[in-house]
């Protein structure tokens, strides 16, 4: 009645670790800046973190199976499958298949809404993100750009209350918010 979780690198039994899986999935090519072709790796071992959570869930499911049937179970989880599942859940696989194109690198911009980094007066960098309506209003008020943002929205014929529209116009908006 043993309940066990076995974490392997790849589904075929070959070795893989978080950083090699990250490269194989292609995320280092998706990060970075559009004008710089170098891949940028992520320092957060995301696949390891997700794999741990999935392993814990698998262990709970196997334990429940044992309590209901009296039989043990072996849950095998491949790190590469975790990464592929995550890429699928985030829409990256379907987007590439449907649009027949790769999502371009967007640097430090936040995908799908407005967010980017700015250099401060003392040469440091700060990340600014405005997703909610309150955050969006606050950013405009803090930078004193409400009239300019309204004028830009009118010129582009968009509604910046929609965060997707803010994402599409992020370069023009960033120019307004620059100190």
Task: Mark where each language-model region is.
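Active-site-adjacent "lid/gating" segments in soluble enzymes
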Residues: 1-130, 138
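Aromatic-enriched alpha-helical interface/lid elements that frame and gate functional surfaces
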Residues: 114-179
């Amino acid at each position: 009645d043993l309940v066990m979780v076995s974490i392997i690198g790849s589904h075929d039994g070959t070795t893989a670790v978080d950083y090699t899986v990250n490269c194989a999935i292609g995320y280092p090519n998706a990060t970075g800046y559009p004008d710089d072709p170098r891949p940028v790796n992520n320092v957060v071992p995301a696949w390891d973190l997700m794999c741990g959570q999935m392993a814990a869930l698998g262990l709970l499911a196997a334990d429940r199976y044992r309590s209901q049937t009296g039989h043990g179970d072996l849950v095998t989880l491949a790190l590469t499958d975790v990464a592929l599942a995550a890429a699928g859940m985030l829409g990256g696989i379907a987007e590439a298949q449907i649009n027949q194109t790769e999502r371009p690198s967007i640097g430090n911009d936040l995908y799908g809404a407005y967010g980017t980094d700015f250099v401060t007066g003392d040469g440091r960098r700060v990340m600014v993100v405005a997703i909610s309506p309150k955050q969006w209003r606050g950013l405009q008020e803090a930078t004193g750009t409400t009239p300019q943002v309204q004028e830009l929205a009118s010129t582009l014929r968009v509604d910046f209350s929609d965060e997707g529209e803010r994402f599409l116009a992020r370069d023009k908006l960033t120019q307004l918010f620059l100190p």
